Each structure stands twice: as C-alpha cells, then as structure tokens.
C-alpha cells in the first residue's frame, strides 16, 4: 500500500509563468450568454484564483450583469465562494456598466475578464475603466452563445427559433422543455 499526498508547492509548476503582484479582479459578464459553458468558466476562474493564491495575492470577483461592492479578500476565500455564483437570465446593460464603475476596488489591480463575447451598451466604458486601473486580460470561449426566440404555436406543433450571435456555420443545439 502506497499513499502519496501533495500539498503546495505545485508538483509541475509552469516555469514560464511570472508570478503576479497586487490585487486581481476576476470579472464575469454573468448573463445568459455564458450559461451554456458556465461550469467551464467557473473552472477557469478557479484556476486563475489558484494562481493568485500561490502568489499570495488578494482578489475580488464581480459579475457585470449584477455588480455588487467588490470584496478584496485572499484569493483562496474567493475560490470557496465560486460555487455560489450562477449566470443570470439577462445581459449586462448600461445601468450595470455604470454601477460596475462605482463598485470597482480602489487603487490599481489586474483584471481577468471571463467574457461571453456578447457586446452590450457600456462595454467600452467598462473596458476603459478597467484599463485605467491596470492590465486587462480577456478570456472568451470559442463557442458563440445561442438565444431562443419565443415559442410559436402552429396548430398542434410548437416552433422554436434559435439565433446565433455570429453568422458562422450552422450547428446543432439541444433544447430541453419541461411542462
């Protein structure tokens, strides 16, 4: 019987990675556009916060779709809070963009923006406000979000139309209906 236990430092650290310094803001668009791959977004957020924790950095996590006052805490604390976050059924808008600027952490910080790639009113202003506070890295999924139009009843059938954010090749999607 062999039992192996590892606890930091990392077994195979990324030797090319330069440790960061100062606070980190993990910014999530947080709307329906990121719902299809929310688990992957949370996994990436966890990895980014783990890197920050290894560098003894503090962090804050904010959703653009529902900005709340930034709590700058040890990055490991935020890792424990990630499971409590969920995508919201709306996109960020100009009001949430303006509110976000008011709740950003004080001083300089690095921003790691996990974006769903959908444009929204106020996005350029958000980016400018973030860039004024420090470097910004934007992470986007390779999958464009899909929106569903309201269901249309045609006799005894239901018709549903899906809209793509980009005019790329047709793709298959799955929709689950309950009720």
Task: Report each predicted region and the residues it spans.
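N-linked glycosylation sequons
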Residues: 1-179
């Amino acid at each position: 019987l062999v039992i192996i236990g590892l606890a930091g430092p990392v077994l195979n650290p990324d030797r090319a990675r330069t440790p960061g310094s100062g606070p980190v803001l993990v910014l999530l668009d947080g709307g329906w556009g990121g719902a299809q791959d929310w688990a992957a977004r949370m996994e990436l957020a966890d990895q980014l916060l783990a890197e920050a924790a290894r560098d003894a950095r503090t962090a804050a996590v904010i959703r653009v779709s529902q900005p709340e006052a930034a709590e700058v805490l040890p990055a490991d604390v935020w890792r424990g809070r990630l499971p409590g976050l969920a995508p919201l059924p709306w996109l960020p808008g100009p009001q949430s963009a303006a509110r976000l600027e008011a709740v950003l952490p004080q001083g300089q910080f690095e921003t790691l923006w996990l974006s769903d790639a959908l444009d929204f009113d106020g996005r350029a202003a958000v980016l400018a406000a973030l860039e004024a506070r420090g470097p910004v890295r934007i992470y986007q999924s390779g999958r464009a979000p899909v929106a569903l139009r309201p269901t249309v009843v045609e006799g005894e059938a239901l018709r549903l139309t899906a809209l793509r954010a980009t005019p790329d090749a047709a793709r298959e999607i799955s929709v689950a209906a309950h009720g």
